[in-house]
Amino acid sequence: MPPARRVPRGSDRTSRSQSLRYTVDASVFVNAFNPHEDGHAASLAILTATQQGGDPVIVPTLLLPEIASAVTRASDDTAGALQYVSATAALSHLTLVSLTPVTARQAAELAAAHRLRGADAVYAAVARRYGTTLVSRDEEQRSRASAVVMCQTPEEALRSRQTPKRTRRSRTK
């Protein structure tokens, strides 16, 4: 697997990239994989929309083993799970962020301060560090992480992408 790509931080981001940058929890990727789960259509739709729009999705490398584990346990299909992991890792708009000692410490602080599960805190730390919206199917994660980052369900993320189009008024003298 290629090394994680570097993501620029700071004030040089454009307003478009600030409003359409996401950290997507494994719960959404797993839900999008299984057409029999409630919410599958919205999870698949937000992943498709970010890909088609080229919107940055910045996730911890932890995403990959989480997907492999959940898909294999639900389907007993190791090869299919690993194929999905490979396809996910290869997405051009997806950036994998390594769990460095600094990120791990930030996640630990979030876990302790907001009673987040360990993996949930890692996603929240990545979202906070890169100024992204955390998209998750996990109600507890969204509720607890919302103290530090913007959190949305896939349905909410889809709605927020739909901005009203402005029409030009003609000026008459």
Could you tell me what each predicted segment is?
Residues 28, 63, 103, 122-123, ...:
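Alpha-helix capping/helix-boundary segments
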Residues 2-59, 74-86, 159, 163, ...:
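Short, well-structured N-terminal submotif of metal-dependent ribonuclease cores
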Residues 79, 95-97, 114-116, 139:
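Recognition helices and adjacent regulatory flanks at domain boundaries
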Residues 24, 58-59, 98, 118, ...:
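Short beta-strand scaffold positions
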Residues 2-21, 96-97, 124, 128-173:
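Acidic, PIN/NYN-like endoribonuclease modules and their adjacent C-terminal/linker elements
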Residues 35, 61-62, 86-113:
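Acidic catalytic patch
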